[in-house]
């Protein structure tokens, strides 16, 4: 099975401006992400960006770069433009690896592509990890996902879902029971689906939560979740996240 990785990267992050180029252990963050993608065995790895600074840095460490519009509202929209520009076929599998996930294991990238290949009836495959700490469950920067019994996503939210009606009022003594999952921002799609995604209007829930994957559920698409057996390392959304990631190195 062949797959490609596209890494969407922008400079103007709201919570941590310029984060794609922040230094982590002597390398820009985007380089760590790129190197993980290369180790996954992907047929090709491309960085998609609208920023000349990111392009220059990426080309300096040997990456292929596709320049895209600055008007995109999500990584999926940026990847869709890049896939068309690069001439990818509709049935090819693309893994969207966000440029702020420097600690994603290469095996997880490949596993996601394999999962989509095994599920012809789904639009997207994505990754989640069990939540084991109460602070993470209530962290608004962490995206939670509720699954059905076959590991299809029912809903995503920044809120702590599913809500424990009888237990969440006492957070200090709260014991998690394995029912809560954190969504990791990595997706696998077929190229043909990206064109379909762009034809859909953003839905109310997507706008409220600022979560692009809710558009897929709103329009009746299915997202199959790969549940990691162990906790995946954190992505970088804030200065605090950056310090935690630096500590890993």
UniProtKB/Swiss-Prot annotation:
It comes from the Bacteria. Gene3D superfamilies: Spore Coat Polysaccharide Biosynthesis Protein SpsA, Chain A. Its EC number is 2.7.7.38. SUPFAM superfamilies: Nucleotide-diphospho-sugar transferases. GO terms for molecular function: 3-deoxy-manno-octulosonate cytidylyltransferase activity. It holds the Pfam family CTP_transf_3. The keyword Cytoplasm applies. One of its GO terms (cellular component) is cytosol. InterPro entries: Cytidylyl_trans, KdsB, Nucleotide-diphossugar_trans. The keyword Cytoplasm applies. It is an enzyme of class 2 (transferase). Activates KDO (a required 8-carbon sugar) for incorporation into bacterial lipopolysaccharide in Gram-negative bacteria. Belongs to the KdsB family. NCBIfam families: kdsB (TIGR00466), PRK05450.1-3 (NF003950), PRK05450.1-5 (NF003952), PRK13368.1 (NF009905). This is 3-deoxy-manno-octulosonate cytidylyltransferase. It comes from Coxiella burnetii (strain RSA 331 / Henzerling II).
């Amino acid at each position: 099975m062949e797959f490609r990785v596209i890494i969407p990267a922008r400079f103007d992050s709201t919570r941590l401006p310029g984060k794609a180029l922040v230094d982590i252990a002597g390398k820009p963050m985007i380089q760590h992400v790129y190197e993980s993608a290369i180790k996954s065995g992907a047929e090709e790895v491309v960085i998609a960006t609208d920023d000349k600074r990111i392009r220059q840095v990426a080309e300096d460490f040997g990456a292929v770069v596709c320049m895209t519009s600055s008007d995109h509202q999500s990584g999926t929209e940026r990847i869709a433009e890049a896939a068309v520009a690069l001439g990818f076929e509709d049935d090819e599998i693309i893994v969207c690896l966000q440029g702020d996930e420097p600690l994603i294991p290469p095996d997880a990238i490949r596993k996601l592509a394999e999962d989509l290949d095994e599920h012809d009836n789904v639009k997207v495959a994505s990754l989640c990890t069990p939540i084991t700490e109460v602070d993470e469950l209530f962290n608004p920067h962490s995206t939670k996902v509720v699954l059905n019994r076959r590991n299809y996503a029912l809903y995503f939210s920044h809120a702590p879902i599913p809500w424990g009606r009888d237990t969440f009022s006492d957070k200090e003594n709260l014991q998690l029971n394995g029912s809560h999952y954190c969504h990791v921002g990595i997706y696998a799609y077929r190229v043909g689906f990206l064109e379909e995604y762009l034809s859909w209007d953003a839905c109310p829930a997507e706008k409220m939560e600022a979560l692009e994957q809710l558009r897929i559920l709103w329009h009746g698409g299915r997202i199959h979740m790969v549940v990691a057996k162990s906790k995946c390392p954190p992505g970088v959304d804030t200065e605090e996240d950056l310090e935690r990631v630096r500590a890993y190195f």
